Amino acid sequence: MTVDDTGSGADGDGRVDPEPAPDSADPGEDPLALRLEGLILGAERRYTPFQAARSAGVSMELASRFWRAMGFADIGQAKALTEADVLALRRLAGLVEAGLLSEAMAVQVARSTGQTTARLAEWQIDSFLEGLTEPPEPGMTRTEVTYPIVELLLPELQEFLVYVWRRQLAASAGRVIQAGDDEEMVDRRLAVGFADLVGFTRLTRRMEEEELGELVEAFETTSADLVAARGGRLVKTLGDEVLYAADDAGTAAEIALLLVETMAHDETMPELRVGIAFGTVTTRMGDVFGTTVNLASRLTSIAPKDAVLVDTAFAEELIRTRDAPASEAAAAEEAAAAEKEGEEPPVYRFALQPMWQRPVRGLGVVEPWLLTRRDGGGGEA
């Protein structure tokens, strides 16, 4: 919903250019689509982009930047905007004018919100229609059924969306507060894990599209549930791969092993391999970047099937937090010493086995470690 803003707004002398002539409405627009739009937006079309920007007191250039950031299509000067579009512009611009956000940050807010909700909206509509096996009335098409479904679900989903957003915002704010210093709010030490389905490309050639979609959905759903349940954060899903982060190495290790164990018990799933690295990570717009992330990805590519490889920094962190012994020999010595003193031996959740050093593209020579559970260990039910 962007426009060509050349020549729009005020010029260098403060003169306001005349309003562009509105484009004629598309006579081919589906009446049902227009009714559905009116239902969802809760208002009728009243403004062209130029009129909306002027009503909001925002320059055409800034309005266009916001709309592009939100992912809206170019509509020229068609009368397609509502009072809500004006209010949204006014609010974003107001945050900038009040000094609460810089202009660049306001654009980032618009972009992150647009990208997230665009995917959410596509997923919800597809899921609702896919799950509809029988129309409410005989002879109704799926297209015709969309209106009553949206009419019933819209208010409930809107409230649910705000609830989940507030919960996620509280959790994210809590992580920032716990980071302690200002530098760690953007650049933090995290454990980052990649989980990758082995042989996915070959599967795409053998499986029907519907079967492939079901497999990917099952993988993403299972991964998301396990990551969240164990206290990690799912950063993103890439079809055959998921990226997650955790504040501590023990949590990341537990998630990785549970993912491998869970997928191994599902006969419909290919083998899984996981790579984890620990170190400084830059966070931007919900994503993570940096050498640590790249290393985790490279470790995944060299990991054996149904196995977890970690980097040296991650192994050292597990040893430091007493989640894993430095070696099995060291664990045996500690157990013997504890027994001699009549004390309980230390209990470790994980075991680490150093692997051969090997070159990794773009990162030089690394020493991966194989992560497993200690004998007698196991994931929580």
Swiss-Prot record:
It is an enzyme of class 4 (lyase). Coiled coil: none annotated. Pfam families: Guanylate_cyc. The keyword ATP-binding applies. GO terms for biological process: cAMP biosynthetic process; intracellular signal transduction. It comes from the Bacteria. SUPFAM superfamilies: Nucleotide cyclase. Residues 1-30 are annotated as: Disordered. Mg(2+) binds at residues 196, 240. Binds 1 Mg(2+) ion per subunit. The keyword Cytoplasm does not apply. PROSITE patterns: GUANYLATE_CYCLASE_2. Disulfide bonds: none annotated. Keywords: ATP-binding, cAMP biosynthesis, Lyase, Magnesium, Metal-binding, Nucleotide-binding. It catalyses: ATP = 3',5'-cyclic AMP + diphosphate. Residues 191-300 form the Guanylate cyclase domain. Belongs to the adenylyl cyclase class-3 family. This is Adenylate cyclase. The lineage of its organism: Bacteria, Bacillati, Actinomycetota, Actinomycetes, Kitasatosporales.
